[in-house]
């Protein structure tokens, strides 16, 4: 989610993880994408992430409220421990059953819960409405749909690994692709409903963990 968070990114010692803690969670984007993330996180009011790690620590370092969705229970627990002293940050664990590398479902026995990954974070009591959403985890196309359905104002969406993965590109029928920065797409997503002629297709995205 690269370069490590540095002391130049620190806004407040009160909200920032200590140096050793931050250094263990580096941004893993390419240099151009990492610079974009740093800039937009600094400009944001509140951040919602699908996928946690270095970007989550960056948000805390900048003093931004952040909620990160995770499907890997062990990783979610580790991130929760890291963020425990920082009430502006939290991890939203979405139980999609057993997972393997990168939080992909390990088998389909819990497929009936897949929709909880994109959607249930929006039901959290007291959720600070995000104006920036990072999509860098599972069910990526569905996460954009969930954002469109649940946001009440236009939001900026950073969609990682978008460039060469053509199976994501149909989301352009739902949101405005503003620009590409390396492999990352920058969208403006406005509140809306799924067009009737796309309903079958988009519902399928909630079962696609890519």
Where are these regions (language model features)?
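SAM cofactor-binding core of SAM-dependent methyltransferases
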Residues: 31-101
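Internal catalytic-core helix/loop-beta-alpha segment
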Residues: 94-146
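C-terminal substrate-binding/active-site "lid" region of AdoMet-derived donor-dependent transferases
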Residues: 123-126, 132-134, 138-210
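Short, hinge-like loop/turn segments at secondary-structure boundaries
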Residues: 66-67, 84-87, 108-110, 174-177
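Non-catalytic N-terminal targeting/anchoring module and adjacent flexible stem/linker
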Residues: 1-24, 199-210
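Short, charged, surface-exposed secondary-structure boundary motifs
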Residues: 75-83, 100-104, 166-172, 187-191
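Class I SAM-dependent methyltransferase Rossmann-like catalytic core
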Residues: 12-44
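Glycine-rich helix-loop-beta junction characteristic of Rossmann-like nucleotide cofactor-binding loops
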Residues: 36-43, 124-127, 149
């Amino acid at each position: 989610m690269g370069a490590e968070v540095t002391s130049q990114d620190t806004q407040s010692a009160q909200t920032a993880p200590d140096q050793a803690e931050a250094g263990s969670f580096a941004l893993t984007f390419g240099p151009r994408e990492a610079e974009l993330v740093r800039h937009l996180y600094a400009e944001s009011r509140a951040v919602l992430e699908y996928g946690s790690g270095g970007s989550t620590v960056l948000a805390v370092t900048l003093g931004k409220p952040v909620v990160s969705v995770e499907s890997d229970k062990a990783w979610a627990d580790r991130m929760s421990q890291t963020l425990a002293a920082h009430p502006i940050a939290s991890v939203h664990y979405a139980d999609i059953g057993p997972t393997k590398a990168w939080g992909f479902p390990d088998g389909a026995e819990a497929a009936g819960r897949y929709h909880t990954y994109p959607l249930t974070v929006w039901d959290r009591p007291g959720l600070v409405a995000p104006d920036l959403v990072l999509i860098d985890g599972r069910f990526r196309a569905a996460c954009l749909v969930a954002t469109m359905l649940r946001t009440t104002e236009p939001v900026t969406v950073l969609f990682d690994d978008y460039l060469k993965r053509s199976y994501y590109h149909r989301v352009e029928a739902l949101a405005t692709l503003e620009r590409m920065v390396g492999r990352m797409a920058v969208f403006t997503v406005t509140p809306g409903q799924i067009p009737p002629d796309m309903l079958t297709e988009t519902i399928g995205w909630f079962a696609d963990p890519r």
